[in-house]
Design a protein with these regions (language model features):
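Phosphopantetheine-dependent thiolation modules in NRPS/PKS and related acyl-activating systems
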Residues: 1-39, 43-94, 98-105, 109-135
Length: 135
């Protein structure tokens, strides 16, 4: 299990989660766990998320997208608001081939994932990076 999924599972006090887990439907869901996820996103992943935005999130994939966008914004040196799940390599000037490789190299230790060499050409969007997490 990668670092992000483990963090979410720990906050939710469940054995494991997948990207498609609807986190509000986990056993024992309560406002304390919601607060725990908000704190985790901000403190552990550098992704401060307001309550209104948090209420829009449904799955662990949505939480992961928030964390990955904050991470990518730091690597690319762009505002978080300029990125979304659909943002692709080359769609903004800062996401060039060099920064694309930086995203791959820095995401692996940060998120505890491994992108096999043959998958890297397929990592075109933020959501592609998340979907390719090997768990």
């Amino acid at each position: 299990m990668n670092k992000f999924l483990k963090s979410v599972a720990d906050v939710l006090e469940v054995g494991s989660v997948t990207l498609d887990t609807p986190f509000r439907e986990t056993e024992g869901w309560c406002s304390l766990k919601a607060f725990g996820l908000l704190v985790m996103l901000e403190n552990d992943w550098g992704a401060p998320t307001g309550i209104d935005r948090f209420m829009e999130l449904k799955t662990v994939r949505d939480l992961c997208r928030e964390a990955f966008i904050a991470f990518a914004a730091g690597v690319l040196k762009v505002p978080r608001e300029s990125l979304s799940g659909e943002t692709a390599c080359g769609s903004i000037p800062e996401w060039d081939s060099v920064n694309h490789l930086r995203l791959v190299m820095e995401a692996e230790p940060k998120f505890g994932v491994s992108y096999p060499l043959e998958t890297i050409p397929g990592l075109k969007t933020v959501d592609d990076f998340i979907s390719a997490f090997l768990v």
